[in-house]
Amino acid sequence: MAADVDKTPAGEQKDDHEDRGTPSSRRGRSRFTQISSLFIIAAIPVIGVCIKYYLDIQFVKRHEAGLKALGADGLFFFSSLDTDHDLYLSPEEFKPIAEKLTGVAPPPEYEEEIPHDPNGETLTLHAKMQPLLLESMTKSKDGFLGVSHSSLSGLRSWKRPAISSSTFYASQFKVFLPPSGKSAVGDTWWIIPSELNIFTGYLPNNRFHPPTPRGKEVLIHSLLSMFHPRPFVKSRFAPQGAVACIRATSDFYYDIVFRIHAEFQLNDVPDFPFWFTPGQFAGHIILSKDASHVRDFHIYVPNDKTLNVDMEWLYGASETSNMEVDIGYLPQMELGAEGPSTPSVIYDEQGNMIDSRGEGGEPIQFVFEEIVWSEELRREEASRRLEVTMYPFKKVPYLPFSEAFSRASAEKKLVHSILLWGALDDQSCUGSGRTLRETVLESSPVLALLNQSFISSWSLVKELEDLQGDVKNVELSEKARLHLEKYTFPVQMMVVLPNGTVVHHINANNFLDQTSMKPEDEGPGLSFSAGFEDPSTSTYIRFLQEGLEKAKPYLES
């Protein structure tokens, strides 16, 4: 009986051993909970690795199955449509093939398109084009030996604009207006920002159809589609996109110059892709500050250089090992406004329509007031600002060949000369030239040394070959000969005396091989003592300094 008596004093809470347990048991449960939690946390990355391993195995199996079913070329074409690289084609990815087979294309679905007033002003643009001169291509010299006819099929058949005339709403050109905080003459901004740099690399070549344009890309895509149905608003190589600069301003209008880097893919399946990359699209627009009226619009590919288009095409299923490259001359590619934008209807003070442009009728006649600019820049200066925005290496002036030597002689400086196939300051530039301008040539230490001790210049090989044969200008002809004597493909950097003597030179490929970082290289990748310089920057500075040293005996004599 005594065992059944509860001897707990009155007012005290009774311990429930079954529910609460001893302190040691509570500690045991706590340890178990902690260990379980740690185990779960540790297991998560293991599970993730296992899942990734499983997915990778499945992807490899699908790739092998695709290769077995389609062959290398077939899988290449499949991959060009498979934009998310999952080895499955969604209806959206299959759409280009459906359009090709049926001949029917659904209306384009552009994202983020700005709504337009159906009664607003409209602008009519006309496209003009002269096809690329095939004889200007390097491979034409041997009759395109080794180049299959199918590779150039898209280029040979492209003789005229895809759309000769098209009408746009004036409000669509709102994309060219400056953003907030950019309203002063000389201000520059990105209309379409570049998403590539030396670290991101470039976009793939094995694509046939451009992605759906978004936002401000929509108008640019529509404009370029007047030339060819497959424009890529974002080019494969940096700098991509479009930049703009306010050239002039008045109370109600802006005059804006702009520069666009875009390209076209010319071939259809079953031929492999052919990329046609103009050096740039330059242009200007005069529009009201509310984008309700466009006074003038013009966009064109500059044709003032002997070569202005880069071309690259695949002739096999491997993206890198089966690539051909050439450069050529495009005489004309431009869009121009028929006249200022005009309203399709006019209303009197009572809101009654008093005149209308009927279908097939004569256009309404308007008289436009003269625009008086309150502030403006020379067009050349505005274009230079665009150039520096896209290419920081142009913070140093690069003068034409003849002008560079005249300036060097007057200032008693050396000429820092770069000789290459494509223009250094546009998209017709070759691969090693692109690497140079995106790395060493834009680095602050190199810019400072070039500004202090050199006159800089770049030249096309073709231009110096022509200059070498100019019997009317013996002095410049000799300078061109001395340059070409030291030139090796594709890019040669030189330190040259004002009289044309080359005192130091290096090939771009050799330079890049010397400065590329390899896993087996010893030592730090950056020189902290030199202000965080990378190896290529310090090597280029050493190249320039060696040139200065070698030139001393000539300059002091």
Curated annotation (Swiss-Prot):
Where does the UniProt annotation locate this protein? Endoplasmic reticulum membrane
What are the alphabetically sorted keywords of the record? Endoplasmic reticulum, Glycoprotein, Membrane, Oxidoreductase, Selenocysteine, Transmembrane, Transmembrane helix
Q: Where are the transmembrane segments?
A: 35-55
A GO molecular function held by the record: oxidoreductase activity
* Inactivation phenotype: Emrbyos show disruption of muscle architecture and greatly reduced motility. Embryonic muscle tissue display disorganization of the sarcomere and myofiber attachment defects. Embryos show a defect in the generation and development of slow muscle fibers and a decrease in the expression of myogenic lineage genes in slow muscle cell precursors.
Q: Where is this region: Disordered?
A: 1-28
Q: Where is the composition biased (Basic and acidic residues)?
A: 1-21
Task: Please give the residues the UniProt entry marks as glycosylated.
Answer: 451, 499
Q: Chief localization class?
A: endoplasmic reticulum
Any one Gene Ontology cellular component term annotated for this protein: endoplasmic reticulum membrane
**GO terms classed as biological process:** calcium ion homeostasis; calcium-mediated signaling; muscle cell development; muscle tissue development; regulation of ryanodine-sensitive calcium-release channel activity; skeletal muscle fiber development
Function of the molecule = Plays an important role in cell protection against oxidative stress and in the regulation of redox-related calcium homeostasis. Regulates the calcium level of the ER by protecting the calcium pump ATP2A2 against the oxidoreductase ERO1A-mediated oxidative damage. Acts as a modulator of ryanodine receptor (RyR) activity: protects RyR from oxidation due to increased oxidative stress, or directly controls the RyR redox state, regulating the RyR-mediated calcium mobilization required for normal muscle development and differentiation.
How it assembles, according to the record, is: Interacts with ryr3.
Name under which the protein is recorded: Selenoprotein N
Biological source species: Danio rerio (Zebrafish)
